[in-house]
Amino acid sequence: MAKTPTRSRKRVKKQVADGMAHVHASFNNTIITITDRQGNALAWATAGGSGFRGSRKSTPFAAQVAAERAGEMAKEYGLKNLEVFVNGPGPGRESSIRALNAVGYKITNITDVTPIPHNGCRPPKKRRV
């Protein structure tokens, strides 16, 4: 019995003028997510997913490449302006913002949303190398 071919509709990409870029910069990796104003993800990229492994993953250059990839993927939605939210202490904080600017987005606002404890949990012990 032959299957009747089901017609698949091509998804229409919605056009968004303003968006938000969430940069999560940890010590080991950098994750960039570009969302619309409601927080729905449009594109994302990581330093590890951009071809960097091990200690090279935690470099500013890896964060720059990841931000460029996420920025190019989000171009399909017609984004022009970005509001950047930076979270974490990692080395890719500044380079990812510069890369998003170089892709062609107008950055309207940069906000640091790193959670700062009011003397909460005990931090990890200092490394002895």
Swiss-Prot record:
Q: Which Pfam families does the record cross-reference, listed alphabetically?
A: Ribosomal_S11
PROSITE patterns listed in its UniProt record: RIBOSOMAL_S11
On the tree of life, the source organism's domain of life is Bacteria
Task: Show the SUPFAM superfamilies listed in the entry.
Answer: Translational machinery components
Q: Which InterPro entries does this chain map to? A: Ribosomal_uS11, Ribosomal_uS11_bac-type, Ribosomal_uS11_CS, Ribosomal_uS11_sf
Biological process, per Gene Ontology: translation
KW Methyltransferase (keyword) present: no
Q: Please name the GO terms that the record assigns under molecular function.
A: rRNA binding; structural constituent of ribosome
**Keywords recorded for this protein, A-Z:** Ribonucleoprotein, Ribosomal protein, RNA-binding, rRNA-binding
Query: Which GO terms of the cellular component aspect does the record hold?
Result: ribonucleoprotein complex; ribosome
Subunit info here reads: Part of the 30S ribosomal subunit. Interacts with proteins S7 and S18. Binds to IF-3.
Role of this protein: Located on the platform of the 30S subunit, it bridges several disparate RNA helices of the 16S rRNA. Forms part of the Shine-Dalgarno cleft in the 70S ribosome.
Q: Which family does it belong to?
A: Belongs to the universal ribosomal protein uS11 family.
Q: What's the protein here called? A: Small ribosomal subunit protein uS11
Instruction: Name its species.
Output: Idiomarina loihiensis (strain ATCC BAA-735 / DSM 15497 / L2-TR)
